[in-house]
Design a protein with these regions (language model features):
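C-terminal amphipathic alpha-helical interaction region
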Residues: 491-693
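Histidine/acidic residue-rich metal-binding segments in metalloenzymes
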Residues: 6-95, 99-115
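Short linear, low-complexity motifs centered on an aromatic residue
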Residues: 71-86, 106, 111, 205, ...
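Active-site proximal loops enriched in glycine and acidic residues that flank catalytic Cys/His/Asp
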Residues: 42, 66, 94, 272-274, ...
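Gly-rich Lys/Arg/Thr-decorated short loops/hinges at beta-loop-alpha junctions or inter-strand turns
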Residues: 1-12, 32-33, 150, 221-230
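Glycine-rich, acidic/polar active-site loops that bind/position phosphate-bearing ligands
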Residues: 118-304, 313-316, 323-559
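Flexible inter-domain linker/hinge segments
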Residues: 1-14, 167, 171-174, 391
Length: 693
């Protein structure tokens, strides 16, 4: 049963309470809930209890599990064994080993924070995230920092941002008389999209192996035109994978809830129940890792790239974000009468102001080479950041701005017209799937995040920008003689000054680009365009003032993101050249030679050879074009090495190299459409996308 296996591999609260002495358990809870310092004596007791629990489950090793700036997790395994006299060993795990580790920091991305010869780095236990057993190893969630204390990971800043929004939200809540609230946390439920393909097909595609996406591939006769895959019947192999995945996730305490087919062929989605943001980030990393591992067991490969196939939808990760108090109140819950809910309206305005003032940071938080293929491609939100509030909330805000009466709307009963079907109330607002940042009930759904990315960066930005607006609100209201009057003016002024960010229309419509420009909204189409704003003074001041990033830490992340962008495209370009020179051109050239021989033989016999003659001419022309296109790409890659700095190099890849790759792909894909299947060196889109039955 699910209840028997759920969290069975997690040293969770129930396990701690059962295994720890009462005073130790209370001390640990004070650390987790209030951020109190953990005494080494307490850590030693906790470490020993964890070790005993893990050994009972067959564990021999432990690891400090952390999230460097690579976007994936890292771990180094150490055994529990310790030598004793007589050549024997005992199993030990000390408080110091629990609290602190020392991996090599020089081999991870640091953005200049560490030189290659400066190898010392530290991992430190994140007591707010439960330890778990994975692949027979006790995993201890940790943060990762340099010898000088600079954050080298994704989690440290996330935890700092959670503290920032907690501090500022508590200030605002106290003004409303919420004396019983002691902490505020953000919660997240990230919907994870992915593709599953047959491993035999995957193994024959160099591009999938090296880059995670197809760099060549002519469109299959059928794609997603019929909308028959979305929510369609799940195929047996996929269903078996999903069942296996759910069980593995449940054992690790991941609240896997929903599974279904997505829009594109071979595309699927898994959505979890909400949990505290840093735990959600850990769980999402585990989810992506387990998706890959479980797929292998079923003869499948899980593709998490944002755009693995051209011509069909790519994959995203919808980041459902909300703010809640420790008393169980969702601060983004409108309630039955949102127009009378001043606390809700104030927090809503903080989010509106944050999104408007920091459009650039939200775009930066989702910027990657892979996600650039997806954003603005009529399958995902545009690269322009805007907010969807729906008609009800928009009308309320308009009434407040104009100081006009708002009578409210009674909830409408939806009648379908069949007497045997139940009646139910229509939601206050429809869903807008084209909006990057949309209200969906009592949360915001940020849809720009790419499927392969960690959710840590995005939520670090979200938490920090909202914390900043709450700080400004608290500063103003705390000193107000007339609190209600000042709050009314603040809400009204915020709506007036920031309503440009609200757009309830079709984000896919070309006219929105022009309208957004008229409104003064940013349209940062590519990763380099977005990263050009990362170190703007207002952004540096924001993170430094809330102690989320130092200027050096932010600069390092800018450098890592910029370098990663160029490195990814370089790998893709080199892979294209390898496939072109070594596989495509030899295969098509050989076939053209054979075709020419057949053409000459037919002509010698006086037979009609129109097909052979036309195809030979067409393939010869395409071969020549492919040869030239590959040569240009190769030369431009060589020339790119002379770029003076990381920004210039990224610009070369954004324009010249990506254009070269597009030109080469067009020619090669055209060759595929007229080449026999047994000649073409790679499985086709049709074979890959429809190969799992």
């Amino acid at each position: 049963m699910v209840t028997d296996i759920f969290s069975s591999m997690v040293f969770d609260d129930a396990t701690m309470e059962a295994r720890l002495p009462k005073e130790t358990y209370k001390a640990l809870q004070r650390t987790i809930k209030l951020g109190k310092h953990l005494d080494m004596k307490v850590a030693t007791v906790v470490a020993n209890a964890r070790k005993d629990w893990a050994i009972e489950k067959g564990v021999t090793h432990y690891t400090h599990w952390f999230q460097p700036m690579t976007g994936v997790t890292a771990e180094k395994h150490d055994s529990f064994i310790s030598p004793k006299a007589g050549g024997k060993v005992i199993m030990e795990f000390s408080g110091k080993e629990l609290i602190q580790g020392e991996p090599d920091a020089s081999s991870f991305p640091s953005g200049g924070l560490r030189a290659t010869f400066e190898a010392r780095g530290y991992t430190a236990w994140d007591a707010t995230s439960y330890a778990f057993i994975k692949d027979g190893v006790l995993c201890i969630p940790t943060v990762f920092c340099s010898y000088g204390g600079e954050a080298l990971d994704q989690k440290t800043a996330l935890l700092r941002s959670m503290e920032a929004i907690n501090r500022q939200a508590l200030r605002v809540l106290k003004l409303f008389g919420n004396a019983d609230v002691t902490s505020v946390k953000t919660t997240v439920g990230p919907e994870q999209e992915y593709f599953l393909v047959d491993k035999a097909m995957f193994d024959r595609r160099k591009d999938l192996i090296y880059t995670g996406r197809t760099l060549f591939g002519a469109k299959a006769p059928k794609g997603q035109e019929l909308d028959d895959h979305y929510f369609g019947a799940i195929k047996p192999r996929i269903a078996a994978f999903m069942k296996d995945l759910n069980e593995e996730l449940w054992k690790l305490g991941v609240l896997a809830k929903t599974e279904h087919n997505e829009v594109a062929p071979a595309q699927h989605e898994m959505a979890p129940i909400f949990t505290t943001t840093n735990i959600a980030a850990d769980h999402n990393q585990l989810t992506m890792e387990l998706m890959r591992k479980v797929a292998q067991r079923h003869g499948l490969v899980c593709l998490l790239h944002e755009k693995p196939f051209d011509g069909v939808n790519g994959s995203g990760k919808h980041n459902n974000w909300s703010i809640s108090t420790d008393t169980g109140v969702n601060l983004l819950e409108p309630g039955e009468t949102p127009y009378e809910n001043a606390q809700f309206l104030l927090f809503l305005c903080a989010v509106i102001k944050a999104v408007d003032e920091y459009q650039d940071l939200l775009r930066i938080s989702v910027a990657s080479a892979g996600n650039d293929h997806r954003l603005g491609a009529n399958e995902a939100p545009p690269a322009i950041v805007s907010m969807f509030l729906g008609s009800d909330l928009s009308e309320i805000l308009e009434a407040i701005e104009k100081e006009a009466p708002y009578d409210g709307k009674e909830k409408e009963v939806l009648r379908i017209g069949v007497h045997t079907l139940p009646k139910f109330q229509r939601d206050a607002t429809d869903r807008n799937r084209t909006s990057p940042f949309a209200v969906t009930g009592n949360k915001f759904e940020f849809r720009m995040l790419g499927s392969a990315e960690s959710i840590s960066c995005t939520n670090t930005v979200l938490n920090t920008i909202v914390a900043e607006e709450l700080r400004q609100f608290a500063d103003l209201l705390e000193g107000a003689e007339d609190f209600e009057g000042a709050m009314h003016d603040l809400i009204r002024g915020t709506i007036r000054d920031h309503k440009r960010i609200i757009f309830n229309g079709d984000g896919y419509d070309a006219s929105w680009v022009e309208e957004a420009e008229r409104r003064g909204l940013l349209n940062l189409k590519s990763t380099p365009d977005a990263l050009a704003h990362m170190l703007d003074k207002k952004n540096v001041d924001l993170f430094v003032s809330h102690r989320v990033y130092s200027e050096a830490e932010l600069t390092a992340r800018h450098e890592v993101k910029l370098e990663n962008y160029s490195k990814i495209i370089n790998i893709e370009a080199q892979t294209m050249l390898d496939m072109t020179w070594r596989d495509v051109l030899p295969a098509v050239s050989g076939y053209t030679a054979a075709l020419t021989e057949r053409l000459q033989a037919k002509k010698a016999l006086g037979l009609a050879a129109d097909y052979e003659e036309e195809l030979s001419r067409k393939l010869s022309a395409l071969l020549a074009n492919a040869y030239r296109a590959a040569g240009k790409l190769e030369q431009d890659l060589l020339d790119s090495k002379s770029a003076p700095d990381a920004e210039a190099l990224a610009d070369v890849f954004k324009t010249t190299i990506l254009d070269d790759m597009r030109d080469l792909r067009i020619v090669v894909d055209s060759m595929e459409t007229v080449s026999p299947a047994d000649v073409w060196p790679y499985p086709s889109y049709g074979e890959i996308l429809f190969g799992v039955r």
